[in-house]
């Protein structure tokens, strides 16, 4: 009787197939190597944590200034420009816009230093211009908070100085324009007075030629330039003397211009306490540092140490098996 030899798939072993149990046994036997590798990795991680620079982020939220914060500035603009002065809402938008631009410029400058500092400004809510979130990354929590407050104040002072300079320039220009306007109106008033005197003198000549000494009309309202001589030479001579000593006649606009000039000259820069922003949230004192993260660093050290240790064990055993062949 012939017995057939059937191949059982479970009894054949592929030499290239990984034996999981054998792998685990190898790792168990080399556990001391793995443990030492993990300990070394943890030691290196602790050393890194000891020397690595800590990063703490302080954050503040700002928005446009209140009306009260720019009351002096708004009043100055009203004095300078009168009816053409910008609205309070426009001033608020302009000020926070200048603050944002100056803050961004400072952040760029700090980032380009030999030892860069991270200062950022961005909208707090996506697709909305205000409020703005500003932040600073420092090596200590207190340092980050202090630096952020310092840089915010620094930018505010810079904007304040720029606004005062702009105001001085605008006041100087406004004063010059008003003075020029007054001089122009005074020249016009003087010319009108001189013209009136010449007209009366001309009428006096006609009256003398016509030998009209007494008024020939009953109502002076009906007298025109052509019939002015009918008032008579005596009246015309008296009118010339009166017009010569009479002060210049100005329109109401002249006195309003003088009042505007006086108001501008009374403006004082020391009284203008301008702020280009308002705090929604003052710089925070961070309670958690951004990096390095102790827990994550140690966990990664354990995993990396274990992987390196396992690699050493398996590599060493593979080398032994290869040499044995």
Swiss-Prot record:
GO terms for molecular function: protein tyrosine kinase activity. The keyword Cell inner membrane applies. The chain crosses the membrane at residues 32-52, 295-315. The keyword Membrane applies. It comes from the Bacteria. It is a multi-pass membrane protein. It holds the Pfam family Wzz. GO terms for biological process: lipopolysaccharide biosynthetic process. Residues 1-31, 316-325 are cytoplasmic. Its main location: membrane. It is found in: Cell inner membrane. Keywords: Cell inner membrane, Cell membrane, Lipopolysaccharide biosynthesis, Membrane, Transmembrane, Transmembrane helix. InterPro entries: Bact_polysacc_biosynth/exp, LPS_length_determ_N_term. GO terms for cellular component: plasma membrane. Pathway: Bacterial outer membrane biogenesis; lipopolysaccharide biosynthesis. Confers a modal distribution of chain length on the O-antigen component of lipopolysaccharide (LPS). Gives rise to a reduced number of short chain molecules and increases in numbers of longer molecules. Belongs to the WzzB/Cld/Rol family. This is Chain length determinant protein. It comes from Shigella flexneri. The lineage of its organism: Bacteria, Pseudomonadati, Pseudomonadota, Gammaproteobacteria, Enterobacterales.
């Amino acid at each position: 009787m012939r017995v057939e030899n059937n191949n059982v798939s479970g009894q054949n072993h592929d030499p290239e197939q990984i034996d999981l149990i054998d792998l685990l046994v190898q790792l168990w036997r080399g556990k001391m190597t793995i443990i030492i590798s993990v300990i070394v990795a943890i030691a290196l991680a602790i050393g890194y944590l000891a020397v690595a620079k800590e990063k703490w982020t302080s954050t503040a939220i700002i928005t446009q200034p209140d009306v009260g914060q720019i009351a002096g500035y708004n009043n100055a603009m009203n004095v300078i420009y009168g009816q053409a002065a910008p609205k309070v809402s426009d001033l608020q938008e302009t000020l926070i816009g200048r603050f944002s631009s100056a803050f961004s410029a400072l952040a760029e400058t700090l980032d380009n230093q030999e030892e860069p500092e991270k200062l950022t400004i961005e909208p707090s809510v996506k697709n909305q211009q205000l409020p703005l979130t500003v932040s600073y990354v420092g090596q200590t929590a207190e340092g980050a908070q202090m630096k952020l407050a310092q840089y915010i104040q620094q930018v505010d002072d810079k904007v304040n100085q720029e606004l005062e300079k702009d105001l001085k320039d605008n006041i100087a220009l406004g004063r010059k324009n008003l003075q020029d306007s007054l001089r122009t109106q005074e020249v016009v008033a003087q010319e009108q007075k001189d013209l009136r005197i010449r007209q009366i003198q001309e009428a006096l000549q006609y009256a003398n030629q016509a030998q009209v000494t007494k008024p020939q009309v009953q109502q002076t309202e009906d007298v025109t330039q052509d019939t002015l001589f009918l008032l008579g030479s005596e009246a015309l001579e008296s009118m010339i003397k009166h017009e010569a000593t009479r002060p210049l006649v100005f329109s109401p606009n002249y006195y309003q211009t003088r009042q505007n000039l006086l108001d501008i000259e009374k403006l004082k820069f020391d009284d203008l306490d301008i702020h280009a922003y308002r705090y929604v949230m003052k710089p925070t004192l961070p309670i958690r540092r951004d990096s390095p993260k102790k827990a994550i660093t140690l966990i990664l050290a354990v995993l990396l140490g274990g992987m390196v240790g396992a690699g050493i064990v398996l590599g060493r055993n593979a080398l032994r098996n290869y040499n044995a062949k």
